[in-house]
Regions:
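Patatin-like phospholipase
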Residues: 1-182
Length: 182
């Protein structure tokens, strides 16, 4: 969800986003937001600091050759700027260190299927790797090489809107029928 929407929701409810939800799920850029909220219990101001124009320029930095080339022979952006920004927020934390359950989507190239990286099933995955994999959009960013040898790309390839997955995961985790998805 967009940071602006989350900010408005927080203002209207007079309750922090972290306190309003029991599980955070996201795909691509939303995966980074979900990880930041679930792992750090961050405030909306922290999300706004992450998604500044300055950070976006670092994330989407191109070499002069890539900017002037007629043909694209490699991903448009490197992972260097993206990983630098991700490390500045997550440091070396693993997703299992989250304060609330977090799920991010990705797509496994070898298995040819969507996958979930979660704080409860994959606790040892570095948060930076999870965020990088879920946002490794083909053509734009390189494929994410995981520590276990898997090659992952942007979760939006198969699950652009992870709401239903969030509902199913919440049903598994919480013993209640009172589940609301936003």
């Amino acid at each position: 969800m967009g940071v602006y929407f989350l900010k408005r929701l927080e203002e209207e409810s007079s309750k922090s986003i972290f306190d309003s939800f029991d599980l955070f799920i996201g795909t691509s850029a939303g995966a980074t937001n979900a990880l930041m909220l679930g792992m750090n219990g961050c405030k909306i101001e922290d999300l706004e600091k992450f998604w500044t124009v300055e950070n976006l320029k670092k994330i989407m930095n191109q070499s002069f050759i890539d900017k002037t080339s007629i043909f694209q022979t490699r991903p448009k952006y490197s992972n260097d700027g993206k990983k630098e920004i991700l490390y500045s927020f997550f440091e070396n934390k693993k997703i299992g260190q989250s304060l609330k359950p977090v799920v991010v989507t990705a797509y496994d190239l070898e298995a040819r299927k969507p996958i979930l990286l979660s704080s409860y099933a994959d606790p040892k995955i570095p948060a930076v790797h999870a965020a990088n994999a879920s946002s490794a959009a083909p053509i734009y960013f390189p494929t994410a090489s995981m520590e276990d040898g898997r090659w992952l790309i942007d979760g939006g390839i198969a699950t652009n809107n992870p709401s239903l997955i969030g509902y199913v995961e919440a049903k598994k985790l919480f013993s209640t029928n009172n589940i609301k998805v936003l």
